[in-house]
């Protein structure tokens, strides 16, 4: 799988060839997680609708839920105005966080919402 050249030309990557992926749940609008992608991970995601990311620690792609069963079916993908971040809107099965939580942002509330 290779990324469409017109999409690749619009992406701004860091020195390691990666860009940020923000993941939002389709039904609730919750932000579930933030991950990294490379061109191949985005190409695979666009082709299969299975959320695929790049692990900086392992130096390889990983498909969300391949081992845990906590999958993300990708409903849509958008590129931000700067070209350095994509937004994946997904249908989440199970927890999105590696801790098992629904969202990676469930654990620490630093500022309570205003009343």
UniProtKB/Swiss-Prot annotation:
Key words, A-Z: Amino-acid biosynthesis, Cytoplasm, Histidine biosynthesis, Hydrolase, Magnesium, Metal-binding, Zinc
GO cellular component: cytoplasm
Cofactor(s) this protein requires: Mg(2+); Zn(2+)
Chief place where the protein resides: cytoplasm
UniProt: Zn(2+) binding residues: 81, 97, 104
Subcellular location: Cytoplasm
Pathway connected to this protein: Amino-acid biosynthesis; L-histidine biosynthesis; L-histidine from 5-phospho-alpha-D-ribose 1-diphosphate: step 3/9
Function: Catalyzes the hydrolysis of the adenine ring of phosphoribosyl-AMP.
Protein name per UniProt: Phosphoribosyl-AMP cyclohydrolase
The organism of origin for this protein: Mycolicibacterium gilvum (strain PYR-GCK)
């Amino acid at each position: 799988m290779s990324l469409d050249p017109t999409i690749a030309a619009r992406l701004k990557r860091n020195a390691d060839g990666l860009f940020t992926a923000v993941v939002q749940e389709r039904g609730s609008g919750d932000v579930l997680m933030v991950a990294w992608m490379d061109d191949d991970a985005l190409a695979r995601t666009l082709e299969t609708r299975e959320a695929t990311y790049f692990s900086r620690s392992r130096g390889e792609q990983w498909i969300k839920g391949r081992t845990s069963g906590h999958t993300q079916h990708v409903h849509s993908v958008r590129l931000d105005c700067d070209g350095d971040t994509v937004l994946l809107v997904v249908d989440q099965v199970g927890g999105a966080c590696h801790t098992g939580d629904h969202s990676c942002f469930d654990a620490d509330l630093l500022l309570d919402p205003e009343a």
